């Protein structure tokens, strides 16, 4: 009975897409009425805070680049679709671990972008963290708050109102999954906040310190969430629909720090429009690697084509005082391996 309840719940659950991702495609000229799929609260916040929307748009480009970096050696490589308001296409309709990662990294990207814009004085509604004033102390002793501490609390609060608005309104199984992974994303940024200090005193003796709180490079957040993706936990809804139960009883329960997902991923080997898979035909692979970037894994056993190409690289670089590095340009001939396309009959079965 419990299994049947979960199955019906998942089948009938409407799919939730994050239409606000499209803000990144619109760029600086964000027109709220042109973003499809926003709920009323999101549209109102969009109209009220055009400067924050611009920051979110710039941030979207950054987190998409980070997603593509993290999955550059993966069959699914975080590809985006032009002129598609879902940005990633039908692949996001499946409640898979890839979807879990995208929700987490996108939310982290919004938090990061808004917090940075605050510190740079680009937003009317916030600036540096007002709580970081006066004196404080750490394990090295006392210090004075100074400089401009990143206002991470504001960077988290606005996305909770804007990004989470659609999921909070729907309150279905997929929405709960999205909210959980959103939380993982925003807490990942906060996890890597650093205390940075400048020493004052004779010859830098550090008798006095001025310190401020600053976000780490976004790559740290991306690396952390990729590790969470690797350890993501498959879940089902619990019987009262208020939370999650682990799908496999041999695995530990999901915590607030874990990414969660409902459905297994497709293999992403061949183009499959219904699953949103672009396939791996034509993808560059590593002939000798046994990892996910290796030709055997990337090409799904179909084999690969080898093309000899000549490219220009910098070589014989030397440092010249002061202060430049000068390089020669050298020709280099290398073999590039790309995955073969599937046989036509195999491809037709997936379309």
Swiss-Prot record:
Protein name per UniProt: Protein Wnt-2b-A
PROSITE patterns: WNT1
Annotated glycosylation sites: 77
GO CC annotations, alphabetized: extracellular space
PANTHER family cross-referenced by the UniProt entry: PROTEIN WNT-2B (PTHR12027:SF93), WNT RELATED (PTHR12027)
A family per Pfam: wnt
UniProt PTM comment: Palmitoleoylation is required for efficient binding to frizzled receptors. Depalmitoleoylation leads to Wnt signaling pathway inhibition.
């Amino acid at each position: 009975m419990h299994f049947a309840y979960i199955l019906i719940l998942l089948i009938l659950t409407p799919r939730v897409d994050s239409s606000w991702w499209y803000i990144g495609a619109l760029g600086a000229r964000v027109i709220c009425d042109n973003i499809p799929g926003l709920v009323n609260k999101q549209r109102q916040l969009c109209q009220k805070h055009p400067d924050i929307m611009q920051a979110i748009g710039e941030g979207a480009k950054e987190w998409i680049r980070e997603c593509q970096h993290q999955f550059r050696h993966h069959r699914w490589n975080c590809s985006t679709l032009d002129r598609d308001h879902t940005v990633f296409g039908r692949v996001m309709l499946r409640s898979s671990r890839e979807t879990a990662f995208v929700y987490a990294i996108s939310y982290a990207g919004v938090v990061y972008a808004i917090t940075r814009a605050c510190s740079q004085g680009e937003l009317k509604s916030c600036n540096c963290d007002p709580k970081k004033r006066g004196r404080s102390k750490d394990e090295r002793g006392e210090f004075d708050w100074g400089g401009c501490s990143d206002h991470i609390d504001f960077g988290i609060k606005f996305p909770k109102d804007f990004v989470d608005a659609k999921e909070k309104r729907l309150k279905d199984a997929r929405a709960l999954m999205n909210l959980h992974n959103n939380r993982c994303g925003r807490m990942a940024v906060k996890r890597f906040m650093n205390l940075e200090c400048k020493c004052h005193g004779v010859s830098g003796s550090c008798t006095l310190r001025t310190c401020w709180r600053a976000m780490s490079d976004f790559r740290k957040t991306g690396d952390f969430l990729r590790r969470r993706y690797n350890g993501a936990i498959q879940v089902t809804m619990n019987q009262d629909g208020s939370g999650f139960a682990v799908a496999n009883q041999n695995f530990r329960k999901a915590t607030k720090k874990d990414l969660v997902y409902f459905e297994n991923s497709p293999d992403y080997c061949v183009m499959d429009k219904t699953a949103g898979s672009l396939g791996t035909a034509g993808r560059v692979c590593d002939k000798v690697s046994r990892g996910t970037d290796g030709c055997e894994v990337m090409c799904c056993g179909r084999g690969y084509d080898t093309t000899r190409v000549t490219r220009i690289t910098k070589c014989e670089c030397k440092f010249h005082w002061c202060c430049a590095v000068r390089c020669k340009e050298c020709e280099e001939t290398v073999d590039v391996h790309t995955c073969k396309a599937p046989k036509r009959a195999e491809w037709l079965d997936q379309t």
